[in-house]
Amino acid sequence: TDYVVKLGPNIADPYGSVTGQALTVRFRTGDQAPDLRLHIPDFVGTYNAYAPARLYASHVNVKRVDLKLYRLTPEDLLQQNSRDWYTNAPPASALVRQWSQALEAPLNKVSYAPIDAQEGGGPLAPGIYLLVASSPSLKDNNYGLRHLMVVSKINLTLKTFQDGALTWATDLQSGQPVAGLSVTFY
């Protein structure tokens, strides 16, 4: 965007000094730096395995997002928990889906794009997943581009007290209690 600022010769500062001459300043601003973020409330999210696994990305001046979806075991999660999630990747054998998605938006305007973790927009099977997003438009900033997805058909309500805990397990679709479920606390 081009800007022109014109200053008159009689502009005074707080002490009464005036510019004494007219001045024209011209400048141009560049395009906004490319940016991409997964539009999520936190690093970890819970997802209903009965519903499509969809989230959104906010983007500006980015034409493509590259995505990888890894399926993790509970053991992977516990081992990874002590590492840096932003620099370590799961093993290639854990990769369940890799794809690219075109992004369209006017120049310098923040826009939002849906991202379906399951091809075709369906639900993911229950499990733990790591979604990793990247783009060739970005430099080294990958903050906000990884998301741990815990997908389940069961809702757990946890009540804790001084020397114990109690949990209720209900089916997310029917709302009915889930009988015989083995629950492990870490």
Predicted feature residues:
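N-terminal, cleavable Sec-dependent signal peptides of secreted/periplasmic/extracellular proteins
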Residues: 1-186
